[in-house]
Amino acid sequence: MCDPTSESQLWRSSSQIPSPCLICRLDHIVMTVKNIEDTTMFYSKILGMEVTTFKGNRKALCFGDQKFNLHEVGKEFDPKAAHPVPGSLDVCLITEAPLEEVIERLKAFDVPIEEGPVFRTGAKGPILSIYFRDPDRNLLEVSSYVTS
């Protein structure tokens, strides 16, 4: 099997010309969690994500054109991350709802805001963000793009 950390990899060569990007968007992220039921309840009630079932009884959280596939720790599906652990995700999610509406929803469910609202830089420009944690202690940043 190819070892991507091997010193002999061609991608390490400084003589290679940078390639054009071959990726256009993110489809899904696999999130390893302690308890799938707690996770689906949190994300559906707090953020309004749609819980879907696929390939038998696997669960996903759908939003926009993306989704989080859920793996319960110790019951992951192959292939999987080298070291899948709950609480290791740090992700920024974009909302089109007023950020105040997200803040009110968090307050209504007693979810503490760790930081924010604060200005940050998103993939497409300035964003206003709040930070909070899910039941596995993953760091969630919910942001809206700043319009002039």
Curated annotation (Swiss-Prot):
Domain (VOC) ranges: 25-145
The organism's place on the tree of life at top rank: Eukaryota
Entry-linked SUPFAM superfamilies: Glyoxalase/Bleomycin resistance protein/Dihydroxybiphenyl dioxygenase (SSF54593)
PROSITE patterns per record: VOC (PS51819)
Matching InterPro entries: Glyas_Bleomycin-R_OHBP_Dase (IPR029068), Glyas_Fos-R_dOase_dom (IPR004360), GlyoxalaseI/FosfomycinResist (IPR050383), VOC (IPR037523)
Family according to the record: Belongs to the glyoxalase I family.
Name recorded for this polypeptide: Glyoxalase domain-containing protein 5
Species of the source: Mus musculus
